Amino acid sequence: MAQAVDASKNLPSDPRNREVVFPAGRDPQWGNLETPVNASPLVKWFINNLPAYRPGLTPFRRGLEVGMAHGYFLFGPFAKLGPLRDAANANLAGLLGAIGLVVLFTLSLSLYANSNPPKALASVTVPNPPDAFQSKEGWNNFASAFLIGGIGGAVVAYFLTSNFALIQGLVG
């Protein structure tokens, strides 16, 4: 097996000898690498359409979208996998747990905002990072909207889970 790999080094036409990882922009001084994953058009499209990098959004709108997603998906593990999962009020415990974690995340974001974070650097995946996170005010707007969105997302998940039988009866 090792013989075949060694022999392929002598054949420039062998596909195993093609370089697939390059320095970003072909400049090794950048300290970033272009790989088949992070330089693919699909990954670039996906990353650049996330709320953190989507162009034209205010920091408040970014925080609201990110918070809603986090609040919504944090509810489930607390409600269905937590220590009160078999209790009658498991959904309420899940709601309170998700809200508590969103509050802790918001405090962490506020602390980070007040620590003078460095400016976002351009990378292979995100060539034009948004300027929404260049100031304390932008980060604090993001954090306050994250709190509102996170609590809202957890409440929506709570109502959907608590009223599942009613929703199922309405739909069919």
Curated annotation (Swiss-Prot):
Keyword Chloroplast included in the entry's annotation: no
Cross-referenced Pfam families: PsaL (PF02605)
Entry keywords, A to Z: Membrane, Photosynthesis, Photosystem I, Thylakoid, Transmembrane, Transmembrane helix
Claim: Transport is one of the keywords in the record: no
Entry-linked InterPro entries: PSI_PsaL, PSI_PsaL_sf, PSI_suXI
GO cellular component, as recorded: photosystem I reaction center; plasma membrane-derived thylakoid membrane
One Gene Ontology biological process: photosynthesis
Broad class of where this protein is predominantly found: membrane
UniProt-annotated location(s): Cellular thylakoid membrane
SUPFAM superfamilies: Photosystem I reaction center subunit XI, PsaL
Bilayer topology term: Multi-pass membrane protein
Region Disordered, residue ranges: 1-24
Membrane spanning stretches: 92-112, 147-167
PANTHER family: PHOTOSYSTEM I REACTION CENTER SUBUNIT XI, CHLOROPLASTIC
Family to which this protein belongs: Belongs to the PsaL family.
Name of the protein: Photosystem I reaction center subunit XI
Taxonomic source organism: Trichormus variabilis (strain ATCC 29413 / PCC 7937)
Gene that this polypeptide is encoded by: psaL
